[in-house]
UniProtKB/Swiss-Prot annotation:
Keywords: Disulfide bond, Plant defense
Entry keyword Iron: no
Species whose genome carries this gene: Melicytus dentatus
Residues in cross-link Cyclopeptide (Gly-Asn): 1-29
Record-given protein name: Cyclotide mden-F
Role according to the record: Probably participates in a plant defense mechanism.
Length: 29
């Protein structure tokens, strides 16, 4: 599995740096 950023996302953007939104969770690049 991908490392989770600990952030949820709803519009394709994550506030955490170097994180990508895979709805509804942000994952580290």
């Amino acid at each position: 599995g991908l490392p989770i950023c600990g952030e949820t996302c709803f519009f394709g953007k994550c506030n955490t740096p170097k994180c990508t939104c895979i709805n509804p969770i942000c994952y580290k690049n």
